[in-house]
Swiss-Prot record:
Any GO BP annotation: positive regulation of type B pancreatic cell apoptotic process
Region listing for Disordered, in residue ranges: 368-402
Signal peptide extent: 1-22
Modified residues (Phosphoserine): 376, 389
Chain segments annotated as transmembrane: 342-362
Organism: Rattus norvegicus (Rat)
SMART domains the record matches: IG, IGc2
Protein name: Advanced glycosylation end product-specific receptor
Side Extracellular, residues: 23-341
Described function: Cell surface pattern recognition receptor that senses endogenous stress signals with a broad ligand repertoire including advanced glycation end products, S100 proteins, high-mobility group box 1 protein/HMGB1, amyloid beta/APP oligomers, nucleic acids, histones, phospholipids and glycosaminoglycans. Advanced glycosylation end products are nonenzymatically glycosylated proteins which accumulate in vascular tissue in aging and at an accelerated rate in diabetes.
A Pfam family assignment: C2-set_2
Residue span(s) of domain Ig-like V-type: 23-109
Domain Ig-like C2-type residues, every copy: 123-219, 233-315
Length: 402
């Protein structure tokens, strides 16, 4: 065994002996050598001693003797009776016992409870916030520590003082994971706060503590996000597709609640005055719409600093294809229908008048022919008389000539 390794082991033993003298608890850093002394062991061979250990490497008590065995690479007994662990690990945590018989035949026992530790790297705040909004919850950042054993704890500080989570204005979400191969821990702590209006610029930091005596916490670099006043929300609008809210059975209706506010408010939906049991979302999708989906819909935007705000309602109706066309142009359709009805009535009256006129004309036609026949005969008689008078005058005119 190299001299340097033995020297470091003895230094560790001397450093820990003060803690062991009063009690039998020892803490050792992972990967470092550890030496445990056996009280009462004879300084000269042959000594009578026995080491027993119950650790993560054993299912029960393991007995070691000075003669050595295959466990020499893990733990072996030195000539002076001490037990050396060249590189202690997590699996070496447990109980170690030594029983020795001195020259006077008196039996002396030594008991040790060994714990190991590993100091992680310096913690850091990932995804730190550069700006916070007053009166609303804000995520400050996530404090991360990697490679610790045991797990340890993460703590947040505000302006140098411990920040105690209260579940309201200060919320901390913690997560602890253990590496399946090394057994070391990774800790994550997410801080969410609700800063007040008009306050000073806060300073946040995070620290890691292993929970061992004489071990100082490891601190992150501080962050100073500025606090701004929340923007009041603008008017809320409810958009519906298809436009007008009228859809055929089996169609799809999409309702979108539009509001401009920072941070974005939570959107809840109401139908016929009753809140719908849905998760907050700015979009409400109604697929395969049926008559049971008909009703008055509206959305409510809840902003932490400004209270709830409800949108104008929208009426969703389910109609057949023909009814849908009629409903889509209800004003124009009714006017055109009235005009068509009036034209139809007038056209019918005109046709009826023509038919009556034709019938009456046909009835009067024979009478007119009867009246015309006598008039023609009288004309012929008058014409004959005129011809005769003209013929009588012609001879008279001839007889009176020179």
């Amino acid at each position: 065994m190299p001299t340097g390794t033995v020297a470091r082991a003895w230094v560790l033993v001397l450093a820990l002996w003060g803690a062991v003298a009063g009690g039998q608890n020892i803490t050792a850093r992972i990967g470092e050598p550890l030496m445990l002394s056996c009280k009462g062991a004879p300084k000269k061979p042959t000594q009578k001693l026995e080491w027993k250990l119950n650790t993560g490497r054993t299912e029960a008590w393991k007995v070691l003797s000075p003669q050595g065995d295959p466990w020499d690479s893990v733990a072996r007994i030195l000539p002076n009776g001490s037990l050396l662990l060249p590189a202690i690990g997590i699996v070496d945590e447990g109980t170690f016992r030594c029983r020795a018989t001195n020259r006077l035949g008196k039996e002396v026992k030594s008991n040790y409870r060994v714990r190991v530790y590993q100091i992680p790297g310096k913690p850091e705040i990932v995804n730190p916030a550069s700006e916070l909004t007053a009166n609303v919850p804000n995520k400050v950042g996530t404090c991360v520590s990697e490679g610790s054993y045991p797990a340890g704890t993460l703590s947040w500080h505000l302006d140098g003082k411990p920040l105690i989570p209260d579940g309201k204005g200060t919320v901390v979400k913690e997560e602890t994971r253990r590496h399946p191969e090394t057994g070391l821990f990774t800790l994550r702590s997410e801080l969410t706060v609700t800063p007040a209006q008009g306050g000073t610029t806060p300073t946040y930091s995070c620290s890691f503590s292993l929970g061992l005596p004489r071990r100082r916490p490891l601190n992150t670099a501080p962050i100073q996000p500025r606090v701004r006043e929340p923007l009041p929300p603008e008017g809320i609008q409810l958009l519906v597709e298809p436009e007008g809210g009228t859809v055929a059975p089996g169609g799809t209706v999409t309702l979108t609640c539009a509001i401009s506010a920072q941070p974005p408010p939570q959107i809840h939906w109401i139908k016929d005055g009753t809140p719908l049991p849905l998760a907050p979302s700015p979009v409400l999708l109604l697929p395969e719409v049926g008559h049971e989906d008909e009703g008055i819909y509206s959305c409510v935007a809840t902003h932490p600093s400004h209270g709830p705000q409800e949108s104008p309602p929208v009426n969703i109706r389910v109609t057949e294809t023909g009814d849908e066309g009629q409903a889509a142009g209800s004003v124009d359709g009714s006017g055109l229908g009235t005009l068509a009805l009036a034209l139809g009535i007038l056209g019918g009256l005109g046709i009826a008048a023509l038919l009556i006129g034709a019938i009456l004309w046909r009835k009067r036609q024979p009478r007119l022919e009867e009246r015309k026949a006598p008039e023609s005969q009288e004309d012929e008689e008058e014409r004959a008389e005129l011809n005769q008078s003209e013929e009588a005058e012609m001879p008279e005119n001839g007889a009176g000539g020179p």
